[in-house]
């Protein structure tokens, strides 16, 4: 595979941006074995945004010859009071439900689950003096203003009442990039600010400097699209506002969970926000794109329509679908039906796993989320 093909894999949907593509090209040209990482807080059930969107890029990176790493951020989750702030529960969920679910999704998407390294945050930090020196070093090169700017909208609005833990979080994220030797830190577009901080301190830190062939480099940040919540009632006004309106583990009707049954998927999609002719921030269109149009189709997607409205449509590409929807030739109800069936087909192996070998994991997660 040549360098341009590898770059195309990294840029492939659902990628939203790479900072920068030219630096990525230089990394590939070096011939150096590159490391990736994506980090996750440990909280509730895994939905299609966390699972399929994120892991689809992990699979792309595997194919591009990059060593992929999934960071299970137990300490970060504890700082953010996830799962009731119970660190033991957070760790248990991380190394069981999260690892096994991600592995299954990687397999379903055509990747190799065994080729991805899963790292628990507390294991990275344990007896690791250099990590803590790195963290302190990073704080020496960041201002309070920079850290505040990297917070979520909610965090920035809290003013003087913000918990100190929230301000510790961004430097921890930055430290993780370097401690994991991640040439390509990866996350949703909502992680952009933290990755920019990592790039800003890359040439200043003394510990864990990121190098390729002895030359110090900045990490190349990869950001994928966020899926809008199913239950939004209007379009977000900006990319940042979308990060506050994305699918949420804590709001079941906002998301398709990877273990949802076919009937649950149909019911959620039927109620989803899907304005006619509107293709921007349309969660139903985005779900159909990730489930049916990530790879070049070998057969057309059939969108069933009543005969009086022209009968069934055969669609070969997402661009064709988007144009048809914008022109009003595909009705929201027909789009929702097609999306539901595509999602059911994609997630069927995952659903079957949680009905069989993974049933105990799912039951344990249900019990944990109820008691938290």
Swiss-Prot record:
Single GO BP term: tyrosyl-tRNA aminoacylation
Catalytic class of the enzyme: ligase
Domain of life of the source: Archaea
Cellular location(s): Cytoplasm
Any single GO CC term annotated in Swiss-Prot or TrEMBL for this entry: cytoplasm
Keywords associated with the record: Aminoacyl-tRNA synthetase, ATP-binding, Cytoplasm, Ligase, Nucleotide-binding, Protein biosynthesis
The keyword Protein biosynthesis is assigned to this record: yes
Residues noted as binding ATP in the record, renumbered to the chain: 249
Gene3D superfamilies: HUPs
EC number(s) recorded for this UniProt protein: 6.1.1.1
Keyword Glycosyltransferase: no
GO molecular function, one term: ATP binding
Annotated binding of L-tyrosine, by residue: 37, 169, 173, 176, 191
Residues spanned by motif 'KMSKS' region: 246-250
Catalytic activity: tRNA(Tyr) + L-tyrosine + ATP = L-tyrosyl-tRNA(Tyr) + AMP + diphosphate + H(+)
InterPro entries per the UniProt record, alphabetical: aa-tRNA-synth_Ic, Rossmann-like_a/b/a_fold, Tyr-tRNA-ligase_4, Tyr-tRNA-ligase_arc/euk-type, Tyr-tRNA_synthase
Primary subcellular site in the record, as a coarse category: cytoplasm
HAMAP family from the UniProt entry: Tyr_tRNA_synth_type4
Oligomer status and interactors: Homodimer.
Reported function: Catalyzes the attachment of tyrosine to tRNA(Tyr) in a two-step reaction: tyrosine is first activated by ATP to form Tyr-AMP and then transferred to the acceptor end of tRNA(Tyr).
Family statement: Belongs to the class-I aminoacyl-tRNA synthetase family. TyrS type 4 subfamily.
NCBIfam families (UniProt xref): PRK08560.1
Identification of the protein by name: Tyrosine--tRNA ligase
Gene behind the chain: tyrS
């Amino acid at each position: 595979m040549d360098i341009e093909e590898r770059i195309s894999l990294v840029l492939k949907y659902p990628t939203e941006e790479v900072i920068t593509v030219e630096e990525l090209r230089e990394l590939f040209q070096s011939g150096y074995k590159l490391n990736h990482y994506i980090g996750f807080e440990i909280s509730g059930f895994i939905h299609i945004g966390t699972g399929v969107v994120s892991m689809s890029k992990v699979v792309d990176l595997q194919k591009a010859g990059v060593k992929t790493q999934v960071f299970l951020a137990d300490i970060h989750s504890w700082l953010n009071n996830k799962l009731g702030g119970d660190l033991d529960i957070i760790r248990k969920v991380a190394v069981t439900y999260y690892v096994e679910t991600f592995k299954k999704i990687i397999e379903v998407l055509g990747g190799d689950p065994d080729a991805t390294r899963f790292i628990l945050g507390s294991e990275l930090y344990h007896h690791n003096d250099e990590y803590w020196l790195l963290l302190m070093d990073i704080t020496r090169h960041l201002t309070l203003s920079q850290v505040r700017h990297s917070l979520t909208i909610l965090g920035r609005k809290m003013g003087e009442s913000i918990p100190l833990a929230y301000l510790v979080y961004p430097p921890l994220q930055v430290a993780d990039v370097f401690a994991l030797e991640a040439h390509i830190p990866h996350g949703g577009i909502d992680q952009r600010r933290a990755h920019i901080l990592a790039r800003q301190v890359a040439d200043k830190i003394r510990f864990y400097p990121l190098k390729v062939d002895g030359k110090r480099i900045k990490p190349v940040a990869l950001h994928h699209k966020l899926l809008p919540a199913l239950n939004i009632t209007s379009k977000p006004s900006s990319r940042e506002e979308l990060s506050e309106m994305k699918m949420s583990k804590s709001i079941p009707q906002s998301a398709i969970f990877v273990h949802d049954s076919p009937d649950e998927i149909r019911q959620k999609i039927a109620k989803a926000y899907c304005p006619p002719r509107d293709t921007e921030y349309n969660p139903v269109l985005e779900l159909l794109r990730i489930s049916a149009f990530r790879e070049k189709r070998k057969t057309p997607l059939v969108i069933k329509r009543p005969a009086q409205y022209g009968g069934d449509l055969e669609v070969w590409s997402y661009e064709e679908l988007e144009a048809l929807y914008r022109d009003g030739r595909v009705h929201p109800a027909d789009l929702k039906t097609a999306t539901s069936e595509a999602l059911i087909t994609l997630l069927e192996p995952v659903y079957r796993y949680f009905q069989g070998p993974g049933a105990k994991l799912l039951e344990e997660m249900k019990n944990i989320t109820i008691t938290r």
